[in-house]
Amino acid sequence: MFQLYRLSCAIVFVLAFAGFAFGQELVTVTRQDQQTVSLSVYETGKVSCRGVAIISPGAGGSEKGYSYLAEGMSAQGYLAIVVGHKESGREAVRQQLRGNGLREGLSQLITDPAAYEGRFMDIAAAKKWSRERCNSPASILLGHSMGAATAMIEAGAKNNLGLTGLNTFDLYVTLSPQGVGPIFSVNAWQAISKPVLIITGTRDNELGGGSWKTRLDPFNNMPPGCKWLGVIDSATHMNFAGHGISRRTELLTVQTIQAFLLSQQQTGCRPPMRERGIEIQTK
């Protein structure tokens, strides 16, 4: 049985993370198939590193995006890394759109097993490189849209693409995750045992116009054990990527992630204080 909570934005937290990232650095690493991977690295300004937070963008995204997430994680003491995924980045989307409409082109890309295999290699290369910069073994995988699907598969979600995740991160944060559909079938998330935070919005509609409520499927299907679901009032899909009038969504997202991380240090993974603008369910 889960509990329902409502959240409102805290100005103190806004001041705590806005512009706090110690520094951004562009790095190129090599993955296991010898292809190069572009990373945006946000060092923490704190004395000790709490762990690595790897951010996987949505289809068409790049290592240059999601700065609000990276800065938020850096402010909390994590080495934050935004990963560029060549097989599903901007150029890959452009190629898919040639001769296809937007919906069909993106649908083909986000259901391409090879694109996910490339993502897993990118993430593994970023994680390996991070060991030289952070002496803490703790690790978090965050993903938006296709990056959320990547994180769910890595966490152990069964899928229709024939992919198997290694479940190597300590916890997962997924923004705009997919529900039952082309990627995931019914009961796909039953085996996920690690802590998971899901965040979506009431205007975060699926590709093709499907209701945002399909994004609740993973939470409803996962077993209890430090699973959180946050729903932000009026947040759109692209707000989570930092586009549009997104500041409010960004602040609530980072604030909720902070509360989720703090809950890991408490007995029972206790939920946050009630705030305006977001509803939190836990189980």
State the predicted function of each range.
Residues 1-9:
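Bacterial N-terminal signal peptides that target proteins for export
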Residues 234-235, 242-283:
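Alpha/beta-hydrolase-fold serine-hydrolase catalytic core, especially in secreted/extracellular enzymes
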Residues 126-191:
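Primarily recognizes the serine-hydrolase "nucleophile elbow" in alpha/beta-hydrolase
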